[in-house]
Regions:
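Active-site beta-strand termini and strand-to-loop segments that position acidic
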Residues: 47-51, 118-121, 131
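Conserved beta-strand in the GNAT
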Residues: 55-57, 117, 126-129
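N-terminal beta-strand motif that seeds the catalytic metal site of vicinal oxygen chelate
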Residues: 1-26, 71-73, 129-136
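Acetyl-CoA-dependent GNAT
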Residues: 57-61, 108-109, 130-135
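Vicinal oxygen chelate
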Residues: 22, 73-125
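Helix-adjacent hinge/juxtasegments
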Residues: 63-67, 71-77
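Conserved positions at the start
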Residues: 12, 44, 113-115
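Core segments of cupin and vicinal oxygen chelate
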Residues: 9, 16-54, 59-60
Length: 136
C-alpha cells in the first residue's frame, strides 16, 4: 500500500475507546503500553502512541453507557514479547482463535505478521504486531 504523501489526505491523530472506569483504564493501559499517559478534563486519559493519541474516555461521567469501539485497534511495537508479558500479567490475552491459532499467543499470521490479541476489561479488541513484520 503506498504511503500517503498528499498533504490534503486526512491523517488520524486520535482514537477514542470508551471505558466504564477511567482510573482502572489509566492503570490498565499504562501498564500494557508501558507509559503513564496524561489525564485530561472531561473524563479522559491520553496515551501518545507514536503520533496518534489513544484517548480512553469514561462516558458514564456524562450519564452515557460505554460501548466497545472498533473491531480491533492495531499497535506496531518493537518488543512484542515485552508487551505480551505485560498483557499476560494483566490477564488480558484474547481467549478466541485467529485463523485457527490462539489469539492471545504470539503467532506468525498467514500474511507474515507476528502478533497477538488482547481484550481490555471493557471488551475492546487490541492487536500488537512486531514492527519488522507489518503488512501494509
Amino acid at each position: 500500500m503506498p504511503s500517503a504523501t498528499n498533504s490534503k489526505t486526512p491523517k488520524i491523530f486520535r482514537v477514542t475507546l470508551e471505558v466504564a472506569d477511567l482510573d482502572k483504564a489509566a492503570k490498565f493501559y499504562g501498564k500494557l503500553l508501558g507509559t503513564e499517559g496524561k489525564r485530561h478534563p472531561g473524563a479522559r486519559h491520553y496515551f501518545d502512541c507514536g503520533g496518534v493519541i489513544l484517548a480512553v474516555l469514561d462516558p458514564t461521567a456524562g450519564g452515557m453507557t460505554p460501548t466497545p469501539g472498533p473491531k480491533s485497534l492495531y499497535f506496531a511495537v518493537t518488543d512484542l514479547e515485552a508487551v505480551h508479558g505485560r498483557a499476560k500479567t494483566l490477564n488480558a490475552l484474547a481467549p478466541y482463535k485467529v485463523h485457527g491459532e490462539p489469539g492471545g499467543a504470539v503467532t506468525k499470521r498467514p500474511w507474515g505478521e507476528r502478533s497477538f490479541y488482547v481484550v481490555d476489561p471493557w471488551g475492546n479488541d487490541l492487536c500488537f504486531v512486531e514492527e519488522g513484520t507489518l503488512y501494509t
